[in-house]
Amino acid sequence: MDPKERIKELREKINYHNYRYYVLDQPEISDYEYDMLMRELIELEEKYPELKTPDSPSQRVGGEPLKEFEPFTHVVPMLSLANAFSEGELRDFDRRVREAVGDVEYVVELKIDGLSVELIYEKGIFTVGSTRGDGIVGENVTQNLKTIKSIPLRLKDDVSLVVRGEVFMPRASFEKLNEEREKLGESLFANPRNAAAGSLRQLDPKVTAKRDLDIFIFNLQKIEGRKFKTHIETLEFLNEQGFKIIPIHKKCSNIDEVIKEIEEIRNLRDKLPYDIDGAVVKVNDLEKREILGQTAKDPRWAIAFKYPAERKKTKVLDIIVQVGRTGALTPTAILEPVAISGSVVSRATLHNEDYIKEKDIRIGDTVIVQKAGEIIPEVVEVVKEERTGQEREFVMPDRCPECGALAVRLLGEAIRRCTGLNCPAQLLRGIIHFASKDAMDIEGLGPAIINQLLSKGLIHNIADLYYLKYEDLIQLERMGDKSVKNLLNAIEESKTRDLDRLLFGLGINLIGSKAAQVIAEHFKTMDNIMKAKFEDFTQLPDIGPKMARSIVSFFAEKQNVEIIEKLKNAGVNMKKIPKEKVNNIFEGKTFVLTGALGNYTREEATRIIEERGGKVTNSVSKKTDYVLVGKDPGSKLKKAQELGIKIIDEKQFEEMLKGENI
């Protein structure tokens, strides 16, 4: 490939994966694969310097911060580290350092696999904590960081300083969290790092407080009124002040000792109660660090040694298909057990049918397996030269292995999904969604009660909710006479919900509350929706081919039609309720919502505004007329204040609905 084209392709890939990792916290590739992409880009740009541009990801530290938290400019830029993957590269680093400053001592530390943060203390008091973001501007997550018990809120001395540390989740806490999420039908975190990042970025600090996060401090960024000679001295000082410093930090006299220590850490890796993805080598002398300086993206006085993902050879004994809580069918390889990274692996994800075809993975193949992100085992390569001719090709089923319903793969998607409302694999999540506030709004019917109803065999689908009796509910834990009667009343009241709420509550793939409104408004009855053809849906505004195929496939499934009939027989409303005439008090007005409202969900508030002629947008601009502010608002409030936009609270909003104070 032409170097210019390859550089362009690499930049696009890296920018995409930066976004997935830094902004969404949903990485798609392992750190090692990402590092290899970045390395190739850097090598090509060095070979062809005329192709290097200021906006290349090789010149950046990371991605942009999320917008939900207030942006915060770091006191000291939070640079990334250059990476080494071999002993030769470590020796090259050592040579460059010694050429610049002579003989040096190094410190070798664990490279914790977590989320990097900056903590600021003023006269001994913790004042601000922020995530790394793009290295220059991060997110202010002070309130969430205060929930981490290992972060001192007050230091031993009244000293002003800035430190950098790594927030992480211990493996035991990660496993416990995923077990709890599985019971509630929530999506599981892929690994402890993702769990730590997702937990720290919760808008509600109470959620963060329950997640058992921890932190290790690994660098003193800045301090007022004191001087230190070495990095080891700063760590000892920080420990005295009450910080939980990086637990393994060994002083080494030369690069040979460094290499030996890195190998010792590698051997220790599986025994640690938290994840590491390498070791960090730092110059110990702080004056020599100043002389060495830094590039635009990393310091010249430190380097990270990254351990490659461990790979092992084994055999594919079978390929089975598992059904997730969202109805996604995932092929899984059953393997001859093999020890990788301290655990025995007997299963590995194959992601989807395209992945199997692309790698040409067959039952009976000899394959190479690795643990991506140190957690999820995956098949990365087939050893085709070891094929015997007895291997069998795998065919992805078009029916759900759990319930037998049609499994549909929409155009442009890699995942095949079960369409069955009765599917046991997705039943808990489906009923939680059906009872949620924006769907049938059954007050008092939460995950804990739904879990009990399912485990006792009292319900097998959403329609069974409407056939529950007093004697069914009174046997449940924490359900007294009053709470049983309240729940039965809530179930009965939900029968009167509008058609779009019912349609949304069915959990049809791609059909959100807005699409459900459009469909219900057009077809008026559930019978009409069920009879409609693909082209009938695509003619509607905002309903594309994927959504049309999804809804047609859903109602083509016999078990779904039977459940609709059962709901109908229970007295659940199946028609569009004519809207009461409301005045267009918000005609031509643009609203932005920020924070949690007390009496409305975001969807309800949006619906109320739109029904009265208004429009709701996601960002504040000069064209915004009102910003409706709830509890814990984000940066939108600050921007509205800067632009002089009218800010209203929930009480003022309700007064406006009555025609007052507009």
Swiss-Prot record:
SMART domains from the entry? Answer: BRCT, HhH1, LIGANc
Residues engaged in binding NAD(+): 31-35, 80-81, 109, 132, 166, 282, 306
Q: Catalytic positions?
A: 111
What's one GO BP annotation on this UniProt entry?
DNA replication
Is-annotated flag, keyword Manganese?
yes
Q: Which SUPFAM superfamilies match?
A: BRCT domain (SSF52113), DNA ligase/mRNA capping enzyme, catalytic domain (SSF56091), Nucleic acid-binding proteins (SSF50249), RuvA domain 2-like (SSF47781)
Q: Has keyword Amino-acid biosynthesis?
A: no
A Pfam family hit: BRCT
Residue stretches making up the BRCT domain: 581-662
What top-level branch of life does the organism fall under?
Bacteria
Q: What's one GO MF term for it?
A: DNA binding
Q: What class of enzyme is it?
A: ligase
* This enzyme's EC code(s): 6.5.1.2
Q: Which reaction does it catalyse?
A: NAD(+) + (deoxyribonucleotide)n-3'-hydroxyl + 5'-phospho-(deoxyribonucleotide)m = (deoxyribonucleotide)n+m + AMP + beta-nicotinamide D-nucleotide
Keywords (alphabetical) are: DNA damage, DNA repair, DNA replication, Ligase, Magnesium, Manganese, Metal-binding, NAD, Zinc
| Cellular component, GO annotation | cytosol
Necessary cofactors: Mg(2+); Mn(2+)
Record: residues binding Zn(2+): 400, 403, 418, 423
HAMAP family documented for this protein: DNA_ligase_A
What PANTHER family does the record point to?
CHROMOSOME TRANSMISSION FIDELITY FACTOR 18, DNA LIGASE
Q: Which family does it belong to?
A: Belongs to the NAD-dependent DNA ligase family. LigA subfamily.
**Function comment:** DNA ligase that catalyzes the formation of phosphodiester linkages between 5'-phosphoryl and 3'-hydroxyl groups in double-stranded DNA using NAD as a coenzyme and as the energy source for the reaction. It is essential for DNA replication and repair of damaged DNA.
Q: Spell out the protein name for this chain.
A: DNA ligase
Gene this protein is translated from? ligA
